[in-house]
Regions:
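Non-transmembrane accessory domains of multi-pass membrane transporters/channels
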Residues: 1-27, 44
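Low-complexity, proline/glycine- and charge-rich juxtamembrane/linker segments of membrane proteins
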Residues: 1-10, 37, 48, 67, ...
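Conserved catalytic-core motifs characterized by acidic clusters
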Residues: 22-40
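Soluble C-terminal extramembrane regulatory/interaction domains of multi-pass membrane proteins
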Residues: 25, 41-163
Length: 163
């Protein structure tokens, strides 16, 4: 359950980021001397919502995996491998953002993961299906973090095979 507590701790971080973004916009509006920073501030503002959504989906995944473990419900093995690949792509995306770059270079790997997610094994176990749905939403959110329009990001994730 420590993982769930860690996941919930991101709420405060998102609130701080949202406040910083709002403050940055306020400073831009009141000081023409800061206009040279407007692109960076606007990029930060545009990141807040999809980042918040991605973190919320991460919490759902963590919670449903914890429930599945508690109830001894099977989660397909392929999900663990897939989540490891998604974690790697997410780390790379975070590296781009830390380097103050838009993570456009991560769009193709995320799109590939979105396509692959439509082919993952299906199961009648609710927790597994919630994990799959949340991971697919998370990929769309990460595509939006990378700079893609949110509706376009959603379109990059094909329907689940056989669904």
């Amino acid at each position: 359950m420590d993982t769930l507590a860690d996941a919930r701790s991101t709420d405060a971080l998102i609130a701080e980021l949202r406040a910083a973004a709002d403050e940055g916009l306020s400073v831009l509006a009141s000081s023409p001397f800061r206009w040279r920073h407007r692109d960076g501030v606007r990029r930060m503002v545009d990141l807040v919502e999809p980042l918040d959504f991605a973190l919320r989906n991460t919490r759902v995944v963590a919670r449903r995996v914890a429930v599945a473990c508690y109830r001894h419900e099977p989660i397909p093995q392929g999900y663990a491998v897939f989540l490891r690949d998604l974690a790697g792509a997410t780390d790379a995306l975070a590296g781009e953002l830390r380097a103050n770059r838009m993570a456009v270079s991560m769009q193709e790997p995320l799109i590939a993961l979105g396509r692959h997610s439509s082919e993952l094994e299906r199961t009648a176990v609710l927790s597994a299906e919630v994990v799959l749905a949340s991971v697919r939403s998370m990929i769309a959110d990460l595509l939006a973090v990378s700079g893609m329009d949110p509706l376009e990001a959603t379109d990059q994730i094909p329907p689940i095979a056989g669904g």
